[in-house]
């Protein structure tokens, strides 16, 4: 990763665009597919790089910035549940200084002179849930989803042992939130059963819990050893208690499982002592934890602190360092992705790290192999932080055998044998053979049918590979003529290995169902390089309809300047992504394929959904010292209500909130005849909003 201190604005913009798409893909894999693609530590590193870039270049913050979002858009197989209060993620602290900074921010924000008590509890490595009770009866269970809309898992959550279906002496409407998990020993037993039944094993306890909870058939969930802890309320917690410790006591009285391992800390020293205790004893716990959560104990103070885009200000997660192991590097294989990117993968002698058997690790790019001087038969250090794909940290040079073998970067594509064009300085190496490369074509079709694209259930990797190998499909369009081809063929799909009458019927139904698709999902399904879900949404918003989109994209091939300018003006579409879009639509076959898809699909026009308030899009300026609230708190409240907080007064300013000793900004506001109010009027205004 580039040095943030030395990076130019142009480089920063490109990197922010790349990070937005990359992190969005990782979020989807983790939250929706229960299949993390990178380690926690690598994800955190990418996310922190994004934050540092945004802090240095705030004017470059993208609409689809990862810092504004949590989780991922939910899949379509479950009904949607809107969270009345968003289920946001937590910011991370990686060392003691980060924790001290967290405590200091609380003091500054709230203007406190003393340490405010902090509630400390283990961070369970499971799946977050919400459960709603009306008149004491469980009515809705939901996953976090994207933080705003989750999946309805009511039937499944009711199968969990000791999960209350009915509770007494509570408000008419009660929401509790917590974590569903599988204990370590239960995970090992479950994987043993999976293996005996010839089914795929789960990667880790979290994946097992997530996969078990997100079953369409609740009888399958009922057979899984799921457990839970509740750790907060949603819209009702202040009706039950005035602090976190009181709330958990009340929830326990209601019959919920709470984690008894906790600490109400009255100093930083007590916080760190609890962290060290859990870090030392984590292996002795029956379940996996990956850190400690710190929350302001007082709910009134929590409310004053509020939230930023994706996390609360009043809480943070102090992460544990990753688990380190050592094993032998057996070989290095190369994968070819849908856009032609070649990625090296380390094949390892299987090793158990933190209860999970690891046999592969991504090497990200070929420069990393040279930089770390990795050789086949080397003994390497692995880092794992609770997820499926570990990271190779380096080589144990003291144990290097005499017969190690260096890895030669390929000169030709391992799939189509076309020559790879790159220089030794290139980080990313690609095959430029496009859809003539079997590996790229396979990955493109698999991407097209994936959950967040066309979402054709029943077409996983194995099925796509089978259909291509049998010559039944060769491009995305062929999928929609598969039934017609099968009906007229003597060799029926249902009679082939791995298929049956029911599975084929369901597949054809799902293909037909997928023909109704939103414009953002359709654009994402095309597999344009660097066009992830968020950038696909940007394009859909810009062009509105399929017909306008394809017409404008055809103009790209005629070098029409207006369309270049329109794309260039889109926030989030930089020069690099613009080149990728142009390259994609410069291929005549791509245009023809999209047109044919447009003839058989019902592609819905883009629809914007946005909540409004009387302050939405209003430009507000704060000046002077506010008597009872900090400037940070005032700004946070304004932004929460949809206002845009500016640092200077201009003719575009809608409102100025003036405190004590307001100077030139107040004077300019008067000159421009802009509405001016004091803190008391501001507090009344936001209360009424």
Swiss-Prot record:
Its EC number is 6.5.1.2. Gene3D superfamilies: 5' to 3' exonuclease, C-terminal subdomain (1.10.150.20), BRCT domain (3.40.50.10190), DNA ligase/mRNA capping enzyme (3.30.470.30), Helix hairpin bin (1.10.287.610), Nucleic acid-binding proteins (2.40.50.140). Residues 610-689 form the BRCT domain. It catalyses: NAD(+) + (deoxyribonucleotide)n-3'-hydroxyl + 5'-phospho-(deoxyribonucleotide)m = (deoxyribonucleotide)n+m + AMP + beta-nicotinamide D-nucleotide. It comes from the Bacteria. NAD(+) binds at residues 40-44, 89-90, 121, 144, 179, 295, 319. PROSITE patterns: BRCT, DNA_LIGASE_N1, DNA_LIGASE_N2. GO terms for molecular function: DNA ligase (NAD+) activity; metal ion binding. The active site is at 123 (n6-amp-lysine intermediate). Keywords: DNA damage, DNA repair, DNA replication, Ligase, Magnesium, Manganese, Metal-binding, NAD, Zinc. Zn(2+) binds at residues 413, 416, 431, 437. CDD domains: BRCT_DNA_ligase_like, LIGANc. SMART domains: BRCT, LIGANc. Its cofactor is Mg(2+); Mn(2+). GO terms for biological process: DNA repair; DNA replication. GO terms for cellular component: cytosol. PANTHER family: CHROMOSOME TRANSMISSION FIDELITY FACTOR 18, DNA LIGASE. Belongs to the NAD-dependent DNA ligase family. LigA subfamily. DNA ligase that catalyzes the formation of phosphodiester linkages between 5'-phosphoryl and 3'-hydroxyl groups in double-stranded DNA using NAD as a coenzyme and as the energy source for the reaction. It is essential for DNA replication and repair of damaged DNA. This is DNA ligase. It comes from Rickettsia peacockii (strain Rustic). The gene is ligA.
């Amino acid at each position: 990763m580039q040095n943030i201190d030395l990076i130019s604005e142009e480089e920063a913009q490109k990197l922010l665009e790349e990070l937005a798409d990359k992190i969005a893909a990782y979020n989807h894999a983790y939250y929706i597919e229960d299949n993390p693609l990178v380690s926690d530590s690598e994800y955190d590193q990418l996310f922190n790089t994004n934050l540092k870039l945004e802090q240095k270049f705030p004017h470059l913050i993208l609409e689809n910035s990862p810092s504004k979002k949590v989780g991922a858009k939910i899949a379509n197989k479950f009904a949607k549940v809107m969270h009345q209060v968003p289920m946001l993620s937590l910011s991370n602290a990686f060392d003691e200084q980060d924790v001290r900074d967290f405590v200091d921010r609380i003091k500054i924000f709230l203007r406190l002179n003393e340490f405010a008590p902090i509630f400390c509890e283990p961070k369970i490595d499971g799946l977050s849930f919400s459960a709603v009770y009306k008149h004491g009866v469980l009515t809705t269970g939901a996953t976090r989803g994207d933080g705003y809309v989750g999946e309805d898992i009511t039937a499944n959550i009711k199968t969990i042992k000791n999960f209350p279906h009915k509770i007494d002496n509570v408000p008419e409407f009660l929401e509790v939130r917590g974590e569903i998990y599988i204990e370590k020993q239960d995970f090992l037993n479950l994987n043993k059963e999976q293996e005996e039944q010839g089914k795929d094993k789960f990667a880790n306890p979290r994946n097992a819990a997530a996969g078990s909870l997100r079953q369409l058939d609740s009888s399958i969930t009922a057979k899984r050893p799921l457990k839970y802890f509740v750790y907060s309320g949603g819209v009702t917690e202040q009706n039950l208690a005035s602090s976190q410790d009181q709330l958990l006591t009340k929830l326990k009285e209601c019959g919920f499982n709470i984690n008894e391992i906790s600490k109400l800390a009255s100093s930083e020293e007590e916080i760190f002592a609890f962290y060290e205790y859990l870090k030392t004893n984590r292996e002795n716990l029956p379940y996996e934890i990956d850190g400690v959560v710190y929350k302001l104990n007082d709910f009134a103070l929590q409310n004053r602190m509020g939230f930023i885009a994706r996390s609360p200000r009043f809480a943070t997660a102090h992460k544990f360092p990753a688990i380190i192991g050592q094993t032998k590097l057996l070989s290095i294989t190369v994968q070819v992705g849908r856009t032609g990117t070649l990625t090296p993968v380390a094949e390892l002698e299987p090793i158990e790290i933190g209860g999970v058997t690891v046999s592969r690790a991504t090497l990200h790019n070929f420069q990393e192999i040279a930089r770390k001087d990795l050789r086949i038969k080397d003994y390497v250090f692995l880092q794992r932080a609770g997820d499926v794909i570990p990271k190779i940290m380096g080589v144990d040079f003291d144990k290097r055998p005499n017969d190690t073998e260096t890895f030669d970067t390929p000169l030709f594509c391992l799939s189509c044998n076309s020559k790879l064009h790159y220089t030794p300085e290139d980080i990313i190496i690609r095959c430029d053979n496009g859809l003539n490369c079997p590996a790229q074509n396979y990955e493109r079709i698999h991407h097209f049918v994936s959950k967040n694209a066309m979402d054709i259930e029943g077409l996983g990797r194995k099925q796509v590979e089978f259909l291509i190998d049998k010559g039944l499909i060769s491009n995305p369009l062929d999928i929609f003529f598969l039934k017609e081809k099968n009906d007229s063929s003597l060799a029926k799909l249902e009679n082939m290995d791995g298929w049956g009458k029911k599975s084929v019927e369901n597949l054809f139904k799902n293909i037909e169902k997928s023909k109704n698709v939103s414009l953002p999902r359709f654009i994402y399904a095309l597999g344009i390089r660097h066009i992830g879900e968020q950038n696909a949404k940007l394009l859909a918003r810009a062009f509105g309809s399929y017909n306008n989109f394809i017409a404008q994209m055809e103009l790209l091939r005629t070098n029409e300047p207006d369309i270049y300018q329109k794309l260039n003006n889109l926030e989030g579409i930089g020069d690099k992504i613009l080149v990728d879009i142009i390259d994609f639509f410069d291929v005549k076959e791509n245009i023809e394929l999209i047109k044919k898809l447009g003839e058989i699909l019902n592609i819905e026009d883009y629809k914007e959904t946005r909540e409004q308030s009387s302050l939405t899009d209003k430009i507000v300026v704060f000046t002077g010292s506010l008597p009872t609230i900090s400037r940070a708190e005032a700004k946070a409240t304004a932004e929460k209500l949809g206002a845009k907080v500016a640092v200077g007064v201009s003719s575009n300013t809608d409102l100025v909130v003036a405190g004590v000793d307001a100077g030139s900004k107040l004077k300019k506001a008067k000159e421009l005849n802009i509405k001016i109010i004091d803190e008391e009027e501001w507090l009344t205004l936001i209360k009424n909003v």
